[in-house]
From Swiss-Prot:
Pathway: Amino-acid biosynthesis; D-alanine biosynthesis; D-alanine from L-alanine: step 1/1. Catalyzes the interconversion of L-alanine and D-alanine. May also act on other amino acids. GO terms for biological process: D-alanine biosynthetic process. The active site is at K34, Y253. Its cofactor is pyridoxal 5'-phosphate. The modification N6-(pyridoxal phosphate)lysine is found at K34. This is Alanine racemase. The keyword Isomerase applies. It comes from Nitrosococcus oceani (strain ATCC 19707 / BCRC 17464 / JCM 30415 / NCIMB 11848 / C-107). NCBIfam families: alr (TIGR00492). GO terms for molecular function: alanine racemase activity; pyridoxal phosphate binding. The keyword Isomerase applies. It catalyses: L-alanine = D-alanine. It is an enzyme of class 5 (isomerase).
Length: 356
């Protein structure tokens, strides 16, 4: 195949889930598979991560897709619901809701459903995105416990804003706030991937790993391999053209890169239309025949151009890897001034995923 494909390593997924268990042995695992399993394929990933204790998604459509694929474990809808139709659909699929504002609570009190739902309550401990202010959490819990649409209030959760930052002053404050919220009898959940790795006292009853399941590090200067994770996605393609250029020849849109000498370049079938970052700069590493070569010129919609001076025997059809076990997605993200989350999630639908 001369076009891009994403190879998904099932054994690496299972390994990374086990790594979470090793780091948080006393916690249950809510595997975060939102955004199409971080670009790896929602149901494909869930089928491999069946040993997780629950799944977490952001959208109702993701949750129903898991149910339709046959998954019967708890599926937690992190964003909750916003109207009667969504609530009824959530009830029909036996989902677990996150309730993070009073409009959702009002809806649960107003609408009658035949199958009451378990809920988590979300508190805003400092990220100021979703969640009840700490001082009203007890009131929200009390109302939910009296609500006919609520089967049970399972637990209290919050989200860490900067656990992945090297100079993180906020996480201890958030944890102190979280622990100060009165929620007797409720399970607790706070830890994302970064906190699973470096804040064991944030593990509580449930951890919510996302990025680390897919083998990447949430830390700006780290790699998943450095903490015992295995890369799950290999984004690969092939060379589709070889050119022998002269000194002064320019490459790509805008003629932004000029050949310093007579040299060979290769064109690979991969571009921003496939999810490769358009802002990857010249010098971004790409593997040709397993060896690194630099990207040169701008990324096009369907193609990238590579400096083959260190690969004089490269030919049309040779394999090209944009990221994978031997070229961390974190490194590519740094060259594109972005984060691995974005690179994995933005691999487009025209790139076929193959589980191996």
């Amino acid at each position: 195949m001369n076009f891009p494909q994403a190879i998904i390593d099932a054994s690496a997924l299972r390994h990374n889930l086990q790594r979470v268990r090793e780091l948080a042995p006393r916690s249950q695992i809510m595997a975060v598979v939102k955004a199409d399993g971080y670009g790896h394929g929602l149901t494909r990933v869930a089928d491999v991560l069946v040993a997780a204790d629950a799944f977490a998604v952001a959208r109702l459509e993701e949750a129903t897709a898991l149910r339709q694929a046959g998954h019967r474990c708890p599926v937690v809808l992190l964003g909750g619901i916003s109207d009667k139709e969504q609530l009824q659909l959530a009830a029909a699929h036996r989902l677990t809701l996150v309730v993070h504002e009073f409009a959702q609570l009002d809806l649960l009190e107003r609408v009658r459903i035949t199958s009451p739902l378990p809920v988590w309550v979300k508190a805003d401990t400092g990220m100021h995105r979703l969640g009840f202010p700490p001082q009203v959490v007890a009131k929200a819990i009390a109302r939910l416990r009296c609500c006919p649409a609520v089967a049970s209030v399972v637990g209290l959760m919050s989200h860490l804003a900067s656990a992945d930052e090297s100079e993180d002053f906020l996480t201890p404050i958030q944890l102190q706030t979280f622990e100060g919220i009165a929620a007797p009898g409720l399970l607790r959940s706070m830890a994302n991937s970064a906190a699973v790795m470096v804040y064991p006292y944030a593990h509580f009853d449930w951890v919510r790993p996302g990025l680390m399941l897919y083998g990447a590090s949430p830390f700006a200067h780290g790699t998943g391999a450095a903490v015992g994770l295995k890369s799950v996605m290999t984004l690969q393609t092939r060379l589709i053209a070889i050119h022998h250029l002269r000194p002064g020849d320019s490459i790509g849109y805008g003629a932004t890169w000029v050949c310093p000498e007579a040299m060979t370049v290769g064109v690979a079938a991969l571009g921003y239309g496939d999810g490769y970052p358009r802002h990857a700069v010249s010098g971004t590493p790409v593997l040709v025949n397993g060896r690194p070569v630099p990207l040169v010129g701008r990324v096009s919609m369907d193609m990238i151009t590579l400096d083959l001076r260190t690969q004089p025997k490269a030919k049309v059809g040779d394999p090209v890897i944009a990221w994978g076990p031997n070229l961390p997605v974190e490194e590519v993200a740094r060259h594109a001034t972005t984060i691995p989350y974005e690179l994995l999630c933005q691999v487009t639908g025209r790139v076929p995923r193959t589980m191996e």
